[in-house]
Amino acid sequence: ELRPGIYIIKDGPLKVDRGGSLLGENVGFYLTGDTSKLYFNTLSTVDLTAPKTGIMAGLLFFSNPKNATMTRTLGAKVLVRGHVIRSDDARRLVGTVYLPDDKLVIDGNSPVADKSEYTVIIAKAFQLNNGPNLVLQTDYDASDIPVPDGVGPMKESSVRLLH
């Protein structure tokens, strides 16, 4: 089990393979470098909550926006980096998953994040394969993990678009 804190993943994957587990309360992962990515394989266990305080309060995963995530092919931008969750036991992911220029693929047979008080996902592209069940809870008040500004519950003074 990880100790509370910030973990920097630089120039390589954060991989949890078959039979492996990644467990931690009050942990944040900062992904930096062109080859940093998440890969949670089948038969792995992932149970994480984001930090309560500090610079990454509420952020479970943060991908550095300066990472090279796209390449040009005949003038078009193509995503070259993707994060994959195939785990059959990634039931608790409390916090914000911030991958603004990356693709997130959920490709498992069991529910993902269904036991979380809340999960926010921010990604450039999002893909669900093989009938996975991604559950994005929004019970923000049930958690002491803060919700970063700009995501989560709307405040009365927030700007809203109405039809």
List where the protein language model places each region.
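Long, polar low-complexity repeats
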Residues: 1-135
